[in-house]
Amino acid sequence: MAKTKYEVTYIIKPDIDEDSKKALIDRFDKVVTDNGAEELESKDWGKRRFAYEIEKYREGTYHIMTFVAENSEPVDEFGRLSRIDNQVLRSMTVKLDK
């Protein structure tokens, strides 16, 4: 089966401390790899101001992860867990061209 390349961008609440932020990022990286994906890159974009408020926040910490997977299981599990976690304000997953 052909592997598909995905990019996930998620926004973390700005008031979370550094240790908790690192633990959150590590947990989401592990969720993706535990579900059969190969992580290519995981990088922090830092704090950025929003164009509009999200859950009463005017800024958030952006994080981007790129990975390849044979099926959508890592994407589905990441989406499910990011919606449950109250430290994540928003997330978006896109399928990249080969």
Curated annotation (Swiss-Prot):
**Top-level taxon of origin:** Bacteria
Alphabetized, the UniProt keywords read: Ribonucleoprotein, Ribosomal protein, RNA-binding, rRNA-binding
Q: Where is the signal peptide?
A: none
Q: Which InterPro entries match?
A: Ribosomal_bS6, Ribosomal_bS6_sf, Ribosomal_S6_plastid/chlpt, Transl_elong_EF1B/ribsomal_bS6
Q: Where does it sit, as one GO cellular component term?
A: cytoplasm
GO molecular function list: small ribosomal subunit rRNA binding; structural constituent of ribosome
Listed Gene3D superfamilies: 3.30.70.60
What stretches pass through the bilayer?
none
A Pfam family hit: Ribosomal_S6
Q: Name one GO biological process term.
A: translation
Function summary: Binds together with bS18 to 16S ribosomal RNA.
Q: Which family does it belong to?
A: Belongs to the bacterial ribosomal protein bS6 family.
Q: What is this protein called?
A: Small ribosomal subunit protein bS6
Task: Please name the taxonomic classification of the source.
Answer: Bacteria, Bacillati, Bacillota, Bacilli, Lactobacillales
Q: Which gene encodes it?
A: rpsF
